[in-house]
Swiss-Prot record:
Catalyzes the deamination of dCTP to dUTP. HAMAP family: dCTP_deaminase (MF_00146). GO terms for molecular function: dCTP deaminase activity; nucleotide binding. This is dCTP deaminase. Pathway: Pyrimidine metabolism; dUMP biosynthesis; dUMP from dCTP (dUTP route): step 1/2. DCTP binds at residues 112-117, 136-138, 157, 173, 183. It is an enzyme of class 3 (hydrolase). One of its GO terms (biological process) is dUMP biosynthetic process. The lineage of its organism: Bacteria, Pseudomonadati, Pseudomonadota, Gammaproteobacteria, Lysobacterales. Keywords: Hydrolase, Nucleotide metabolism, Nucleotide-binding.
């Protein structure tokens, strides 16, 4: 597998709809000229933004977190330009961008250093071959203080790995009817 460059990312987004909406360059300021956490195409990746849709984890129901029987009541829904994550807690969000991953590509998501240096960790599982949808993002606040996440700004970087032509997967995410195929909002655990 080889990592793909900005040239390849632009081609796949603009000619094949791999990322929508798509920003071919790096955006570092908003419309009023204020500096923001950058998003868009980088040298070997794509920096995604999160939408204004957040689910903030709370333990008001004193529940046990169980991925097989997840209690939706464990989250507070928030729609805002800023999400404040409680200390030592987490929040879910989704990307603004919708992805359509080709059969010969695997995408790895890494957090942006701006957030990592503040103790905010981004966790996303790989975007598998032929998966499509908005990416559900998990932000962990590892600090003992509240932490902010900004909507419509960069939050994570996607790295695109392309398989050699003779080594394309036999079974894609679409082939096996993956449970998160086509997700459009912040998606909670499914079994």
């Amino acid at each position: 597998m080889s990592i793909k460059s900005d040239r390849w990312i632009r081609h796949m987004a603009q000619q094949h709809g791999m990322i929508a909406p798509f920003e071919p360059g790096q955006i570092k300021q908003n419309a009023t000229g204020q500096r923001i956490v950058s998003y868009g195409t980088s040298s070997y990746g794509y920096d995604v933004r999160c939408s204004r849709e957040f689910k903030i984890f709370t333990n008001i129901n004193s529940t046990i977190v169980d991925p097989k029987q997840f209690d939706n009541g464990s989250f507070i829904d928030v729609e805002s330009d800023v999400c404040i994550i409680p200390p030592n807690s987490f929040a879910l969000a989704r990307t603004i961008e919708y992805f359509r991953i080709p059969r010969n590509v695997l995408v790895i998501c890494l957090g942006k250093s701006t957030y990592a240096r503040c103790g905010i960790i981004v966790n996303v599982t790989p975007l598998e071959p032929e998966w499509e949808g908005h990416v559900t993002l998990e932000f962990s606040n590892t600090t003992p203080l509240p932490a902010r996440i900004y909507a419509n700004e960069g939050v994570a970087q996607m790295l695109f790995l392309q398989a050699d032509p003779d080594d394309v997967c036999q079974t894609s995410y679409r082939d096996r009817n993956g449970k998160y195929q086509g997700q459009t909002g912040v998606t909670l655990p499914r079994t």
